[in-house]
Swiss-Prot record:
Designated name of the protein: Probable protein phosphatase 2C 19
One GO process term, biological-process aspect: signal transduction
Protein source organism: Oryza sativa subsp. japonica (Rice)
Any one GO MF annotation of this record: protein serine/threonine phosphatase activity
InterPro entries, sorted: PP2C (IPR015655), PP2C_BS (IPR000222), PPM-type-like_dom_sf (IPR036457), PPM-type_phosphatase-like_dom (IPR001932)
Keyword Manganese in annotation: yes
Pfam family, one: PP2C
Domain PPM-type phosphatase: start-end pairs: 265-517
Length: 652
C-alpha cells in the first residue's frame, strides 16, 4: 500500500479511536458484507476475539454489521437493508463506514440479556465481548444490579433527541464516549476483568433477570434485548422507570380489526401498553370451516410471545382436524388443548411457525456456528407458555374453553355472567397439588374448563380478554361500560379500544375481543312444554290432552303420506311428551309418533325414527332399507321418558 493510503489509514485510526489493524479489518468486512459472499481474510491478530461462522465470516463481522434480533418496530424499507438475505437492521456499532453508506432512522442501540433466560446468555457473551471492543461502555449501576447490558454509542444523561439526531451527520460523533464513573474506556486492555465478572454472573440463581430498574437514566428509553433505544431526555417519573415490565413509556398504539356476518359482529383490539414487548396473541375467524361456525381466542404469553403466537396460528386448525369436530365439539376442543401442549413439549418444530428463518436471533447464532449455545437453549426446563380462552359459535350453540387467567364474560340483558373461572395459583391450583410432593415436582395441567350453552335472544355480547383488562375492571364494570356505550350509539370499534385502554394501568399487554349478537339472529331455545305442540304447517295447536288428538302407541307412522322410506326426521330439539309412552314431534312434519317400539337412527346429527313395523329393541336395524353402514343406532324403550331422550342426544 502506498504512503498516501497509509496516511489515510492512520488518519482513520485517529478519528475512529481504533487500531490500524481493526480499521483494515473493517474495510475488509465492509467489502465482504457488500459482496454477500465468503471473504477470506487474515484474522491471526484476532484469533481470540473471533469465532468463524460456516461461511467464513468472523462473528465480529456479524456483530459489527447487523442488529440481530427481531424488533417489533422493524421495517426493512425504512430501517435498513437486507444483508445476505437476513432481515437484520444495520445499526451504529462503531462502524462509521457502514453507517455512512446505509443511513437509518434510528441507529443507537443496546443489547440486553433477556430476563429469565440465563441458559442462552453465553450466546451473547461473545457478541458483548466483540462489541465492547468497539468502544462500548458499561454503567456501574447496571453492573451492580446485575444488568449485563451491552451499550454502544452512549450519551450523557439528559441529552435531548436533537443531540442524537445531529450526531448522524458526523461520523466521528459516535466514537466520542462519556468517560463517566465505571466506564470501560476506549481501549480493550481493561476489558478482561469486566468480562470475567460478567461471566461469573452466569451462575446467579435469581432467574437471570437483568432488567435495569434504577432511577438514573442515560438519556434513553431503555428496552431489553431486541428493542430500539429512543434517544431523548431522561424520564423523571420513578414509577414509570420502575414499570411492571420494563418500559419507560407505554406503547399506546392499538391494533384493531372488525368483521361481521348476518348473525354476529366482532371487533378485536390489542395494545402493548407498559409491557416491554407484545406477548398477547389472538385469533378471530368469522367462518371457521365455510359454515356458520365462528372461532375467537385470546392467548396471553409468558416468558416470551412465541407460544402465544403459535397457539393463535395453530389452535383452531387442531380443532378442525379433530375427528370429533363435527359430532362432539366439546370433546374436540378439550383434545385440542392437549394436542397443543404435547406439540410444544415434544418438539421444537413449532418454532418454525413463529420464528422466521431469516429474521431471528436463533438463526443468527446457528449461522455463527454457536452449536453449544443452541443446544443449551433448549436443554433446560421451559419457562415460556401461554394462557388460552377460546370461544366457538356453531349454529345456536356456544362453547367456551379456557386454561389460565384470560377470561370470557357474557352480557345477558345488561347483567354480567362469567363463562370462565380464572386459573391462578391461589385458587384451584391449591386443590390440585399433591401436598406430599415438593414444589418443584408439582405438576400443572393443560386440562381446560369447557362450557357449552345455547344462545338465546337475551344475550347481547361477549367480552373475551387477557388479564390486562380484568386486573383493573370487574366483569360487571366491563359489561356496564359496553352496554351503556352501545345504548349511546357508539361504534363497537371505539368501545373495544376504550376497553383496551382501561387495561393500561395494569402494566400488562391487553387484548380484547368484543362479539356482538345481532337481534333476532339467535331465537330463544323453545322451553319444555308438556301441554301444547304447534303444527308447523297449519299453525294450529295440538292439544295432547284432547282424546281426539291422542296417538295409538302401536300405530305406524307410514300413514303420513309425506313420510318417505318409512322414516320421520326428528330435530335434535324435539320435545318428548308423556311419561308412560315416549313420543316426539317431527320437525318437518309435526307428526306425533310413537317411540315405544321405535329404533332411532342418527345420521349427521339428525334423528330418524323407524316406525313402519314393530322392531325388536335388541335386533339389528339392518332390516331398515334406508339404514346405511355409517348410521349409528340407538334403542329407545317405552320407559325412556324425557331424561332418557336428553341423555341419548347428549351422548351424540
Amino acid at each position: 500500500m502506498d504512503a498516501g493510503g497509509e496516511e489515510e489509514k492512520q488518519e482513520r485510526h485517529r478519528v475512529d479511536g481504533a487500531s490500524p489493524s481493526m480499521v483494515a479489518l473493517r474495510s475488509d468486512v465492509l467489502h465482504a458484507v457488500l459482496g454477500g459472499k465468503s471473504h477470506n481474510q487474515d484474522t491471526s491478530e484476532l484469533v481470540t476475539l473471533s469465532e468463524w461462522s460456516k461461511n467464513k465470516f468472523p462473528l465480529y463481522a456479524y456483530a459489527a454489521a447487523f442488529m440481530f434480533l427481531v424488533m417489533q418496530e422493524y421495517d426493512k424499507r425504512s430501517h435498513g437493508i437486507d444483508f445476505l438475505n437476513r432481515d437484520f437492521v444495520v445499526r451504529d456499532l462503531g462502524m462509521p463506514s457502514l453507517n455512512k453508506h446505509f443511513p437509518v432512522k434510528e441507529f443507537y442501540c443496546s443489547y440486553r440479556r433477556k430476563s429469565g433466560h440465563s441458559t442462552y446468555t453465553y450466546g451473547f457473551f461473545m457478541l458483548q465481548k466483540l462489541i465492547l471492543i468497539q468502544n462500548a461502555h458499561i454503567r456501574r449501576e447496571e453492573e451492580e444490579e446485575g444488568a449485563c447490558s451491552m451499550v454502544t454509542t452512549s450519551h450523557r444523561t439528559g441529552h435531548s433527541r436533537s443531540v442524537g439526531l445531529a450526531a448522524r451527520d458526523d461520523p466521528t460523533a459516535e466514537m466520542r464516549l462519556v468517560q463517566g464513573e465505571g466506564s470501560v474506556g476506549t481501549t480493550s486492555h481493561r476489558m478482561g476483568a469486566l468480562l470475567e465478572r460478567w461471566i461469573s454472573r452466569e451462575g446467579r440463581t435469581d432467574g437471570g433477570d437483568t432488567s435495569v430498574q434504577g432511577e438514573r437514566s442515560v438519556g434513553t428509553t431503555s428496552h431489553r434485548m431486541g428493542a430500539l433505544l429512543d434517544v431523548g431526555s431522561a424520564v423523571d417519573d420513578p414509577a414509570k422507570q420502575r414499570s411492571a415490565m420494563g418500559n419507560s413509556l407505554p406503547v399506546e398504539s392499538k391494533f384493531t380489526d372488525e368483521k361481521e356476518n348476518d348473525r354476529i359482529k366482532y371487533v378485536v383490539s390489542s395494545m402493548q401498553g407498559w409491557g416491554e414487548k407484545m406477548e398477547d396473541a389472538h385469533a378471530a375467524i368469522l367462518n371457521l370451516d365455510d359454515t356458520m361456525t365462528s372461532f375467537f381466542g385470546v392467548y396471553d404469553g409468558h416468558g416470551g410471545a412465541e407460544v402465544a403466537s403459535y397457539c393463535a396460528k395453530r389452535f383452531h386448525i387442531e380443532l378442525c382436524n379433530h375427528e370429533d369436530y363435527d359430532s362432539n365439539l366439546s370433546n374436540a376442543m378439550r383434545s385440542a388443548f392437549y394436542s397443543m401442549d404435547e406439540d410444544l413439549q415434544l418438539s421444537d418444530a413449532w418454532r418454525e411457525l413463529v420464528i422466521p428463518r431469516n429474521n431471528g436471533w436463533m438463526y443468527f447464532l446457528k449461522a455463527a456456528a454457536c452449536t453449544s449455545i443452541c443446544k443449551a437453549t433448549y436443554t433446560e426446563p421451559a419457562y415460556e407458555g401461554s394462557t388460552a380462552c377460546v370461544v366457538v359459535i356453531r349454529g345456536n350453540q356456544l362453547i367456551v374453553g379456557h386454561a389460565g387467567d384470560s377470561r370470557c364474560v357474557l352480557s345477558r340483558n345488561g347483567q354480567a355472567s362469567a363463562l370462565s373461572v380464572d386459573h391462578k395459583p391461589d385458587r384451584d391450583f391449591a386443590c390440585k397439588k399433591n401436598e406430599r410432593l415438593p414444589p418443584e415436582d408439582q405438576m400443572l395441567t393443560c386440562n381446560p374448563d369447557i362450557l357449552t350453552m345455547d344462545i338465546t335472544d337475551d344475550m347481547e355480547f361477549l367480552v373475551i380478554a387477557t388479564e390486562g383488562l380484568w386486573c383493573n375492571m370487574t366483569n360487571q364494570n366491563v359489561v356496564d361500560h359496553t352496554h351503556d356505550r352501545l345504548l349511546e350509539g357508539a361504534e363497537a370499534r371505539v368501545i373495544c379500544e376504550e376497553l383496551v385502554q382501561f387495561g393500561l394501568p395494569s402494566g400488562d399487554n391487553t387484548t380484547v375481543i368484543l362479539v356482538l349478537f345481532k337481534p333476532g339472529a339467535y331465537p330463544a331455545v323453545p322451553p319444555v312444554d308438556t301441554d301444547t305442540d304447534t303444527d308447523s304447517h297449519t299453525g294450529d295447536d295440538v292439544d295432547n290432552n284432547d282424546p281426539a288428538n291422542e296417538v295409538d302407541p302401536t300405530a305406524n307412522a307410514g300413514s303420513d303420506d309425506s313420510n318417505t322410506s318409512d322414516e320421520v326426521k326428528v330435530d335434535a330439539t324435539a320435545t318428548a311428551v308423556g311419561s308412560s309412552s315416549t313420543t316426539a314431534v317431527a320437525a318437518d312434519e309435526a307428526t306425533v309418533v310413537s317411540l315405544s317400539t321405535a329404533t332411532i337412527t342418527i345420521v349427521d346429527n339428525y334423528f330418524f325414527i323407524n316406525t313402519s313395523e314393530e322392531v325388536d329393541p335388541t335386533a339389528n336395524a339392518g332390516s331398515d332399507d334406508s339404514n346405511t353402514g355409517d348410521e349409528v343406532k340407538v334403542d329407545a324403550t317405552a320407559s325412556s321418558g324425557l331424561s332418557d331422550w336428553e341423555l341419548i342426544y347428549s351422548e351424540f
